[in-house]
């Protein structure tokens, strides 16, 4: 009987361990900026909308990938931001809202949030990379698979972006980059 119970315990543990989703530790903009003051890190911000199919794919297939989630959690503060939502956000001494938000259109296209406009976001998904002082480094537009997003994560986490300043250097960087993500 003990062997049977032990077997089911181990099987249950194995299924739980292998069946779990890998989660990015998402936080609000304000939480990320406050965390930067205690321990400086760059911010990665996923600007999404509720109606956006590629946004849902990025969340499901990329941000829940074990390698991506682990790397983001170790190297960045991660913000998931609804670019058409109704939240009020205090950022860089300003308050950003969505004054034209229509609650009846919460599942479809809505008006753009002022924070998305501040960052110049007009396509979804857009992943923003911000430096340790919450200044925009670059937007990355569109859906990326884990191996495709990896180069962006690493070029910013390692500060290689500081030495890759021309298009030619970026092309060389891409040619020499070796993916480690699954």
For every predicted segment, state its role:
Residues 42, 97-105, 113-128:
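Structural micro-motif
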Residues 24-42, 72:
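A short beta-strand-turn-helix
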Residues 39-43, 74-77, 124, 132-133:
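Loop/turn elements at helix/coil->beta-strand transitions in domains of secreted/extracellular proteins
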Residues 23-26, 65-107:
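Thiol-based oxidoreductase modules, predominantly thioredoxin-like and allied folds used
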Residues 1-21:
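Bacterial Sec-dependent N-terminal signal peptides
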Residues 20-24, 37, 120, 131, ...:
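Non-globular targeting/processing and membrane-anchoring segments
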Residues 56-60, 130:
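Detector for the c-type heme attachment site
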Residues 39-56, 78:
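Short active-site neighborhood of thiol/selenol oxidoreductases, capturing the structured segment around
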């Amino acid at each position: 009987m003990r062997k049977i119970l032990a077997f089911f315990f181990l099987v249950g543990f194995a299924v739980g361990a292998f069946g779990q989703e890998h989660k990015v530790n998402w936080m609000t903009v304000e939480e990320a900026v406050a965390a930067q003051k205690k321990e400086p890190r760059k911010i990665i911000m996923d600007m999404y909308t509720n109606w956006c199919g590629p946004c849902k794919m990025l969340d499901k297939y990329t941000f829940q990938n074990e390698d991506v989630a682990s790397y983001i959690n170790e190297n960045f503060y991660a913000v998931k931001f609804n670019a058409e939502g109704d939240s009020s956000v205090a950022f860089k001494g300003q308050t950003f809202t969505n004054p034209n938000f229509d609650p009846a259109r919460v599942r479809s296209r809505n008006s753009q949030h002022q924070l998305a406009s501040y960052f110049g976001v007009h396509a979804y998904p857009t992943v923003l990379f911000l430096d340790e002082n919450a200044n925009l480094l670059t937007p990355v537009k569109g859906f990326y698979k884990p191996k495709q997003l990896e180069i962006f994560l690493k070029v910013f986490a390692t500060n290689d972006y500081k030495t890759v300043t021309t298009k030619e250097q970026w092309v060389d960087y891409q040619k020499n980059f070796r993916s480690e993500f699954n």
